[in-house]
Amino acid sequence: QLGKDYALKEHIILDLPNESFISSALINKELKPNEFNTVDDLVSGFVNSYVPFRNMIFLSFALSIAESNNIDQIFVGFNKDDSINYWDCKENFINHINIISGLNTTIKIKSPFINLSKKEVVLLGKSLGVNYDNTISCYQPIGNVECGCCLSCVIKKEAFNE
């Protein structure tokens, strides 16, 4: 829906093999993502929603598509809260991906929210008139309804309630 609201020119959906990532509760339906009541419950380190090298895989595809279509910028929505448990959401990761892609292209990965908390991103969006009604951050939504207790839901809930 958001793509339509913002007149997105093209939306590409890639079909990736899930069976390679069975250690992640986001892929392996036999595992249930860790549940949290508040962000304070979160401990820095491994959470079972981690998909090994997920963002490197996504960015590799994005770089390939961008180069094939003469696109020189790719934007990602990583924020400071993402980097607590996911190494591939950190500024250092983006910097290194840009170094690697710079060996052959001028394409730049941009991460404008990398130093902002989820709360700061929400406040910025509200100040710009972003409609959050159709957004889902949940790791295990049922239809369009968020679970409310996975890591992503708890971070989002606290960002909107603070």
Language-model features, listed with the residues they occupy:
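ATP-dependent adenylation/nucleotidyltransferase module used to activate substrates
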Residues: Q1-L128
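Alpha-helix termination/capping residues and helix-transition junctions
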Residues: D5, S68, Y132, N144-C147
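Conserved S-adenosyl-L-methionine
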Residues: H11-D15, N131-Q140
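Local cysteine-cluster metal-coordination motifs and their immediate loop/turn environment
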Residues: S60, N134-E158
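Adenosyl-5′-phosphate
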Residues: E162
